[in-house]
């Protein structure tokens, strides 16, 4: 009994130590008021910003010695307005260059800490890399990654997607050189953790809607899809583009009917595209939302249009309960749901080319294929 009590005490001590250790992780998001203040601090500490500030010394001397103030004024205005743009561009390029030189260390951190697609798993990786880059003088501050999500996105854009898109070994070696074996090991660890999360998600974390029989799709509440769409784009997310569209209607009142119709049609088309992309961005905030979408497609028993209607109802309820969307109107109907899957998941997988501001979903490729296969089998049945 005493031995068991000692073991229990030790296990409690280990757990409490791990909890304390996790609490000690400090990232810039814990030190700065917002990402904007962190960004301003990083710019202030950059070499490009200091060079831009030093440029004002010779300009001030020129102003004092010059008899003609026109040329100093022109140069000063150029430095004033174009200088910040160059500072931002140079700082962005410096970040990419610094990180590209530390790919091996990045991979070692991923291999050692085994993060999954959950952003919280990347906190240790982000904290360790922040310290490593500063201590090895690869970066001039201790705050390279603002938070875990920024670190995870850097892993995706720097390693995961570029490496996965390389077609053969020669192309990988040409682009990543000596880092190839480390990247392969890190990606292997990451994919295994994502697979564990997928299996856990489908078994223990499986979500089942309650009272779905009474749920209605937006197509049953709105007479036309355009009415539903106009209501959606008039919300807070699309308020500025919507007001811009109203402004375009006012500005175009002097045009001929044909030109005005074409112009306003093009503006409305751009609004539709922005709304569709916004939905995918909202869904991509957490990987578990995309996993739920794919899992719902795979596990749907009904086939054809009725099956997609059921998927749309379930996802509308899920996204509303998870507070991803403010109501149960994310998908208009089954056709809209099927288009969403085809456009943002299967099409990207087939082309293996990322869309603007959207992820390639490399870690979800096997499950996207499985979802597409289940759709094909249902249509054949």
Swiss-Prot record:
The record's InterPro entries line, in alphabetical order, gives: DUP/COS
Query: Where would one find the signal peptide in this protein?
Result: none
Q: Which residues lie on this side of the membrane: Extracellular?
A: 64-72, 253-254
Going by the UniProt record, its keywords in alphabetical order are: Membrane, Transmembrane, Transmembrane helix
The segments annotated as topological domain Cytoplasmic are: 1-42, 94-231, 276-381
A GO cellular-component term linked to this record:
fungal-type vacuole membrane
For membrane topology, the record states: Multi-pass membrane protein
* Subcellular locations according to the entry: Membrane
Q: Tell me its family.
A: Belongs to the DUP/COS family.
Q: State the remark under miscellaneous.
A: Present with 1730 molecules/cell in log phase SD medium.
Please identify the protein, giving its name as recorded.
Answer: Protein COS1
